[in-house]
Amino acid sequence: IKGSTLLSLDMGLLEAGARVVAVEKDARLVEALGELFRDQPQVTVVHADALKTDLGELLRAHGAGGTQGAAAPECKVAANLPYSITSPLLVHILESDLPVERIVVMVQREVAERLVAPPGTKEYGALTVAVQYRARVELAGRVPPAVFVPAPTVWSEIVVLFPREERLAALEVHQHLIELMDEG
């Protein structure tokens, strides 16, 4: 599964032989990507809001890596995330039942620093705990503003997250804790 906003990412995944399920919120981009990849049977473009979508169900529905409707196969997530949704989307993916082997994302450098921050540093906070509880996080490379058009004012970083195997079992415990806190 991947965010579809960076066309070079789509092309690189296809060249590597990947089956791609691209999730895009913007209807105009969905139409353009559908047209661009109409002759590529290994690409499915889905018009959806990744923050509000059951990603495991989406993967099962579109038969990525197997027969439509079959159990979702283990997958990789690759995205150049809009900076405004980075934190909630990473937590959404890690809290989902999506069988993720690895998540590779490009994020704002300051967010990357928060994702890998050790306890006791100023970068360490709620996002750090939420993500590190569910995944091992590694920095994979820094990306300068000059590679983008138009160039942003911030640097980006490629981050790789390896979801912890025990995260799915922990989700049930986590849900019970949330329910207890909500009850007051």
Predicted regions and their residues:
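Catalytic cores of RNA-modifying enzymes
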Residues: 1-183
